[in-house]
Amino acid sequence: KDVSISEIRLQQLPDNTSKEEKEKIIIENLAYGNDVKGLNEHLKMGLKEYVNSDQYKKYLDTISKFHNYSRRNIDLIHQQKPDATLIAGAKKWNESFERYINKGEKGFTIYAPSEYKVKDLNGDFVLDKDGKVKTNIRFIPVKVFDVSQTNGKELSLNSVELENNVENYVDIYKALKEIADKDNIKIVFVDKELMPRAYGSYTPAKNTIELRKGMGQGDTLSTLIHELAHAKYQSKIITTEEYALNELHAGSIAYVTSKHLGLDTSKQSFGYLNSYMKDRKDFTDLDRVIDKIHSDAKDLINKIDTTLEKVKSKEITKDKFQSKIERAIEKQKEKVSQKTQEVMPEKKFPRQPAMKN
């Protein structure tokens, strides 16, 4: 049996080498060796770890931070640098952020788009109808570094995380309701007596989400996101076998989206994942569901972010308009006051007689 370069390098590593460092070596050799099949198989092997609820939540954390990246790149980031928050190549860090790689830091591998000129079988460039050389996009392995591996100019980032307070609760709820309204999904609140065992439910026949009254703000939003995932991204008719996977799908979207919004996710658990995947040797179902979780969470997060911006801009416009009205009212009051003073004659008091001694 041939021994791969990565196996040789792994054998040379100290015993206390971290799992992430070993992953970097394996992935680097598979990616730069153009072994796409081997890389995909290696990443799928990581699915076995997600049967553990805590490990699965850590993976969802990575999706939350990098929801606009491809599924493959999310897997690569999670395997090599699960605590990453913001990544870029060394050149990008230098030129765009004036930051530099810390001495001794090692990058990790992801895939990035690269433009190339198209050639024919004879090696000549192919021209388009305008006589220009045709170009295409391919994805190549590149080295990136997390912000924690860099130093330099302080970053001024617009954080997407929101504190879970009343003001932001109202904004987020408005955004979610607007998204639901576009699909004619009704949202109603019901008494706890009518929903004693659940926080929420979705009824496909009525296209209605029911939420239990009296929940905390974070629970209300997370439950609404969970039920919205059922309503927007799942089939209206499901089999008993599909139920567990559908709950995993909706629960995962709720976790990823809530995490993105800065809501508390500590109460959320995935115990049913362990029971569903128990004794399974084939992880095809889980792989398929994670693909859907990634694409649907990305879609919902982007919709929420866009709608939140609109909600906030409306409030700013409203505040400006309200201020304008208030200023106009004050000016009007001042004018009325001035006119009143001009119209009213000076009040003269009768002269008091001089006191006699």
Predicted regions and their residues:
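N-terminal accessory/interface modules of nucleic-acid-binding and processing proteins
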Residues: K1-K339, M344-K348, P353
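Conserved ATP-binding/catalytic motifs of P-loop helicase motor domains
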Residues: M355-N357
